[in-house]
UniProtKB/Swiss-Prot annotation:
EC nos: 7.1.1.2
Domain of life: Eukaryota
Family: Belongs to the complex I subunit 4L family.
Keyword Mitochondrion: yes
GO cellular component: mitochondrial inner membrane; respiratory chain complex I
Protein name, per record: NADH-ubiquinone oxidoreductase chain 4L
Keyword set, alphabetical order: Electron transport, Membrane, Mitochondrion, Mitochondrion inner membrane, NAD, Respiratory chain, Translocase, Transmembrane, Transmembrane helix, Transport, Ubiquinone
General function of this protein: Core subunit of the mitochondrial membrane respiratory chain NADH dehydrogenase (Complex I) which catalyzes electron transfer from NADH through the respiratory chain, using ubiquinone as an electron acceptor. Part of the enzyme membrane arm which is embedded in the lipid bilayer and involved in proton translocation.
């Protein structure tokens, strides 16, 4: 079981590092965020299975719902920025302020 924890922690760390280093395009940032959410889902699901907690068995489903909402909002922002400005650079996101 320690190998599963190590792999998911490594996947989360690599996704976080990718989010910090490759933040020029919005699409790469969204992919790194999805990798982080997927590794968090696996970690929470394995932890609940190992500890046999029945009260928090819905936690992975709630995490997936938040990940789906985050992906939908991110993709809609990506479509709006690319339709308006023609590029998906993260530096242009401050132009969306009113």
């Amino acid at each position: 079981m320690a190998l599963i924890y190590t792999n998911t922690l490594l996947a989360f760390t690599i996704s976080l590092l990718g989010l910090l280093l490759y933040r020029s395009h919005l699409m790469s940032s969204l992919l790194c965020l999805e990798g982080m959410m997927l590794s968090m889902f696996v970690m929470v699901a394995v932890m609940i299975l190992n500890t046999h907690l029945t009260t928090s068995s819905m936690m992975p489903i709630v995490l997936l719902v938040f990940a789906a909402c985050e992906a939908a909002l991110g993709l809609s922002l990506l479509v709006m920025v690319s339709n308006t400005y023609g590029i998906d650079h993260v530096q242009n996101l401050n132009l969306l302020q009113c």
